[in-house]
Amino acid sequence: MEAMKMRLFVAVLVAAMAFSAVQQAAAVEAPAPSPTSDASLAIPAFFASVATLAFGFLF
């Protein structure tokens, strides 16, 4: 059971890193979001959610 949790945690981390890399590559050519857009908050919110889920699974 512990090994399965660790595999899931590693898989989520790899997916998050891949998602971040793809979004950074796309952001190079994209225009900046408008000041009223909350698009810049999507990545920190995603990492906070993943960290919370990982903490719940591990502890």
Curated annotation (Swiss-Prot):
Record key words, sorted: Cell membrane, Glycoprotein, GPI-anchor, Hydroxylation, Lipoprotein, Membrane, Proteoglycan, Signal
GO CC terms of this entry: plasma membrane; side of membrane
Sites where a glycan is attached: 31, 33, 35
Propeptide, residue positions: 38-59
Main location, first listed in the record: membrane
Recorded topology in the membrane: Lipid-anchor; GPI-anchor
Name of the molecule in the record: Arabinogalactan protein 13
Recorded family membership: Belongs to the AG-peptide AGP family.
Secretion signal, residue range per the UniProt entry: 1-27
Keyword match Membrane: yes
Function statement: Proteoglycan that seems to be implicated in diverse developmental roles such as differentiation, cell-cell recognition, embryogenesis and programmed cell death.
Organism superkingdom: Eukaryota
Annotated InterPro entries: AGP3/12/13/14/21 (IPR039281)
UniProt KW Translocase keyword: no
Lipidation (GPI-anchor amidated serine): 37
Chain positions found as 4-hydroxyproline: 31, 33, 35
